From Swiss-Prot:
Residues 412-520, 532-574, 901-986 are annotated as: Disordered. Ca(2+) 2 binds at residues 22, 76, 78, 84. Binds 3 Ca(2+) ions per C2 domain. Residues 333-396 form the SAM domain. The active site is at 722 (proton acceptor). GO terms for molecular function: ATP binding; metal ion binding; protein kinase activity; protein serine kinase activity; protein serine/threonine kinase activity. It comes from Dictyostelium discoideum (Social amoeba). ATP binds at residues 607-615, 628. This is Probable serine/threonine-protein kinase DDB_G0272092. Ca(2+) 1 binds at residues 22, 28, 76, 78. Its cofactor is Ca(2+). The keyword Nucleotide-binding applies.
């Protein structure tokens, strides 16, 4: 037991200017005093921001040598949910020991967690009473000899008798720990020679002798001692009671020390990013104690600068800025800058080499072929990309004139007069021009959709001039990675190679207008998703423009300018080619075998419509497929999202993921995937005409978790980020497949900022995502936990309920998100649900993500619960409620039974806002057994009568089948909630 040094008396007096937590602008504050593992709290003072505690507010505690600080926390009492955090203050024991008389002070409240809203102060009265009793003399001569560093006495004792190395001193510290902390190398060596020396034992703080040795030792010749301690049982990554490893303790050495011991620990297998119970890494410790050389060494050896740790949680850079150490701030910032730069270039594998050799952005322009040789960078593609990027930093304009801007459009200029000299166009200011976005450093994208009409001499034939229109889209071979969402909105405009004269006016892309004094121009294009007719009359002195909207079926854009020259633009396809997609990281594609000729696709049924495109049921090579078509193929953000989804679906070949057949990139951007005939899990749960039994529950539930596990175990790891029952599809043979990877990301360094953004359907979003923390596998587990709750409720209650629908005051998704993240509100599991199932759901939905199970643990636990069900089927089945419409019915011939046909279901919901269409209901009978797994009805209707030919553009499809209507369904909760399909009307 730790030695007592005194006692402290703390009186919580009052607070002022506290943060309002209730809707009425008030709070119900109370205080909690924490000393070690002991807590005592005051009563709550109702409806005030200036509380005064006058009773039950005085507490006394004993203080021992191990206590570092006393904490006082303030909370807002809440009758119906968890209490809200209002702030805390930490008072060091060293400061408290100075308060030998009653001392009253105001203490400013700090946030308990980074995003907490905190204000105000709390007034405390503190007095410290020192313990005047002297420690008793050591009873053991062995302990006394160690503390006196008497090696001769110890050697005599070892020769005379067998010594007990586990004997402790008066404070409970074992003999071997006292020796390890003595900084006496001969003494420690002598003890370790004892064959019975047990060095794996722990002291009262959970430290091994290795913990104490690396903290107290000042000798550089200590490798033999470390080796012997490890050989005798000290684990290199063993944790003490605070979660500290030997590497953490080495950072706390009280004397100025080189990194020798730290180097030795890493060589022995110490985990450089190991986190304590407060999530601190060794890098955090080195920053806290201000050891610049340690920080430098950790950074050079792979320390993660994005890990948050401490209380409140901070990244290493945030911590360094808070402590105000300019040297450490500079080193951490340099590492972040070079890492971001290499990530944008998709060269993250080179980050360790650059950091190890301290090649940061301040010297990046000095890189040449010789530097790359010294760094042992031999891959030609990496060398080319690096040298190109370095040239762009030196001169951002140097590459713009050589850029090859792709386009599939031709501009045909028809001149009614005898114009054989294109220079007349320039004299009349008729040159078409648009800005080209720079792909310079830090800009993830170029602007797409703009094009420039360039008159070309020597192409005149029968008064026709053909000139090429060049589109502008980033090629990932030559510019930075677009995986980071934060890059999408960065735009750096530069002058094009042939800038417009100052007197000219350049219209905005994607519909450039030729401005001239005596010209008539007609432009036809399929670039824009919305079709318009533009009539423009312009002279050098006066320009007027009128715009009217044409019917959606008319896919042309006409621009009329008075009077004599006509320009026709042929429909422009996507500004993408094979190289744009083949160059993406992590994809498993050979050459261009994945490219699908859109002419081989047949569009049969419109399954759903979202903000960025549509999903069709169709055929490819005689096989039913789902075709996801991008609505706009010139919007740079849409194209970037298309690339991201393509990158995920083309890379994954897991059995629990919808199969990727290929993609079309010529006439339209589309992804062709496996068609799942039974639709989504959401629609299966929503179908209230069919029973959802425990067998269904366990069969689909285990498959769903297993499918998620296949994503998390992929290399590199995939995070779905939008997991919900609507994105779990079910095939004809009841196999669960995960779909909709529009928000999914690889868990790599290039996606760190993206993974910290709020994404997904709010009812399924984990609390940490709301607070801006990085999205992890445990965030996906939370979403799967909500899905498991959804299935549990449907199985027990017999009806489907959306998550949080039992709370009538939560009408909008943002209310759900705030309540779940800040109030710890969770969907209510049925009271009669089996206890094991309730516990599993609760574990997956716990606020602390580190306490949630992994997908493997989740899967294994559900299998155990399934075994429990199989052993107690009657008991489990007895708690289920079966509505009358789900009871077995006799076969009724020729009866039309409304149901959710598989073709009615959105096979790949590409957006939260989804328009669902359905097919004509078919004749079928109600099976005597309503079990879903025994329902063998053929859901694949013969759609031969409904086939339609491929549209010229995706937006011309308003009725994929003449007998089918698109029905937009709305809900009062939010547009991000799942849509409900309805039967088709003729």
């Amino acid at each position: 037991m730790a030695r007592k040094i005194g006692s402290v008396r703390i009186e919580v007096l009052e607070g002022r200017n506290l943060v309002p937590m209730d809707s009425n602008g008030m709070s119900d504050p109370y205080g909690v005093v924490i000393v070690g593992d002991k807590k005592k709290k005051t009563k709550a003072i109702k409806h005030t921001l200036f509380p005064k505690w006058e009773s039950d507010n005085c507490f006394e505690f004993d203080i021992d040598v191990n206590l570092l600080a006393i904490t006082v926390e303030v909370y807002d009492w809440d009758r119906f949910s968890s209490d809200d955090r209002m702030g805390l203050t930490n008072i060091p024991v060293s400061q408290i020991q100075e308060y030998i008389v009653d001392t009253t002070k105001w203490y400013t409240l700090q946030p308990m967690k980074p995003n907490d809203k905190v204000s105000g102060e709390i007034k405390l009265k503190i007095r410290f009473d020192k313990d005047k009793t002297l420690p008793p003399p050591e009873k053991s001569p062995f302990i006394k000899a160690i503390k006196d560093n008497d090696t001769q006495a110890i050697e005599l004792m070892m020769n005379k008798a067998k010594l007990d190395y586990t004997i402790c001193d008066n404070e409970g510290t074992p003999a071997i720990h006292i020796a390890a902390a003595s900084n006496n190398i001969p003494l420690i060596t002598m003890l370790l020679k004892g064959s019975d020396a047990r060095v794996s034992i722990r002291d009262q703080h959970g430290n091994t002798p290795l913990h104490l040795f690396v903290q107290k030792n000042v000798s550089l010749n200590c490798e033999d001692i470390i080796n012997k301690l490890i050989e005798r049982g000290c684990g290199i990554n063993d944790e003490n009671n605070l979660g500290e490893t030997a590497l953490h303790k080495a950072c706390l050495a009280t004397v100025v020390q080189k990194t020798t011991i730290v180097e030795q620990l890493l060589q022995k297998g110490a985990i450089i990013n190991h986190q304590t119970k407060t999530r601190d890494t060794p890098l955090h410790y080195a920053i806290k104690v201000g050891k610049v050389e340690f920080v430098r060494f950790f950074l050079q050896n792979g320390a993660n600068v994005m890990i948050e740790g401490g209380k409140p949680s901070r990244t290493p850079l945030e911590l360094a800025k808070e402590l105000g150490n300019p040297q450490i701030i500079s080193k951490v910032e340099k590492v972040i800058e070079i890492s971001d730069w290499l990530n944008e270039l998709q060269l993250e594998t080179l980050i360790p080499k650059f950091i190890k050799n301290e090649i940061y952005m301040d010297v990046i322009t000095d890189i040449n072929e010789g530097t790359l040789d010294l760094l042992n960078i031999s891959v030609s593609g990496q060398r080319t990309k690096l040298l190109r990027a370095v040239r762009k930093i030196k001169d951002p304009l140097s590459l713009s004139s050589n850029s090859s801007l792709r386009s599939n459009s031709l501009i045909h200029v028809e001149n009614d007069n005898n114009n054989n000299n294109n220079n007349n166009n320039n004299n009349n200011n008729s040159q078409e021009q648009c800005n080209i976005n720079n792909d310079s450093l830090g800009s993830g994208n170029r602007n797409s959709g703009g094009f420039k009409a360039q008159n070309q001499n020597n192409t005149l034939n029968n008064n026709n001039v053909e000139s090429k229109s060049t589109g502008n889209l980033n090629s990932l071979k030559n510019i930075h990675n677009v995986n980071n969402d934060n890059n999408e909105d960065k735009k750096n405009n530069i002058l094009s190679p042939n800038p417009i004269p100052a007197s000219s006016s350049a219209p905005a892309a994607p519909s450039p207008v030729a401005i001239g004094s005596n010209t008539t121009t007609t432009t036809t294009t399929a670039i824009a998703a919305t079709t318009t007719t533009l009539t423009t009359t312009a002279t050098t002195e006066d320009k007027t423009t009128t715009e009217s909207t044409t019917p959606p079926q008319q896919q042309q854009q006409t621009t009329t300018i008075t009077p004599t020259k006509t320009t026709t633009v042929t429909p422009e396809g996507p500004n993408l080619d094979v190289s744009d997609l083949s160059v993406l990281k992590h994809i498993n594609l050979d050459s261009d075998s994945w490219v699908i000729d859109e002419k081989t696709l047949t569009y049969n049924v419109l399954l759903g419509t979202g903000a960025s495109g549509k999903v069709y049921k169709g055929t490819f090579n005689g096989q039913e497929v789902a075709i996801k078509v991008l609505k706009s193929f010139t919007d740079k953000k849409d194209i970037a999202e298309f690339k991201k989804e393509f990158q995920i679906v083309s890379a994954l070949r897991a059995p629990g993921v919808v199969y990727f057949h290929g993609a079309g990139i010529k006439d339209k951007l589309c992804i062709v995937m496996e068609y799942c005939s039974r639709g989504s899990l959401y629609h299966i749960l929503k179908d209230d005409t069919t029973q959802f039994t425990w067998d269904n529950f366990f069969n689909l539930g285990t498959q769903a978790i297993n499918s998620l596990d296949s994503l998390h175990n992929w290399t590199p790891q995939v995070l779905h980020r939008d997991l919900k029952s609507l994105n779990l599809l079910v095939t004809e043979n009841w196999t669960v497949k995960i779909c909709d990877f529009g928000l999914s990301r690889f868990d790599t360094g290039s996606n760190l900022e993206t993974l910290g953004k709020l994404r997904g359907t709010y009812a399924y979003v984990a609390p940490e995502v709301y607070f801006g923390k990085k999205y992890t596998t445990k965030s996906d587990v939370y979403s799967m936990g909500i899905i498991l709750w959804e299935m549990t409720y449907r199985c027990i209650k017999g009806t489907h309920l959306l998550p949080y629908a039992e709370y009538p005051h939560l009408k909008f998704d943002y209310q759900i998100l705030i309540s779940s993240a800040k109030k710890d509100v969770r969907p209510t599991t049925p009271e009669n649900a089996p206890e094991s199932l309730k516990n599993l759901i609760a574990r997956t939905l716990v606020k602390d993500s580190t306490l949630r199970p992994t997908t493997l643990e989740f899967y294994e636990e559900l299998l155990k619960i399934r075994d429990e069900y199989n052993a107690n089927r009657e008991q489990w089945d007895s708690i289920r409620t079966i509505p009358p419409q789900q009871l077995p019915k006799p076969i009724i011939n020729e009866e039309i039974i409304p149901s959710i046909d598989s073709n009615n279901i959105n096979n790949n919901n590409n957006n939260n806002n989804t328009t669902v269409t359905s097919e004509k209901p078919k004749l079928r009978y109600q099976p005597s057994n309503s079990n879903l797994l025994n329902n063998n009805n053929n859901n694949n209707n013969n759609d031969s009568d409904n086939n339609i030919s491929e549209p010229a553009t995706t937006d011309s499809i308003t009725k994929p089948i003449s007998k089918v209507k698109e029905q937009l369904l709305t809900r009062t909760r939010s547009s991000s909630s799942p849509m409900e399909p309805k039967s088709i009307k003729k």
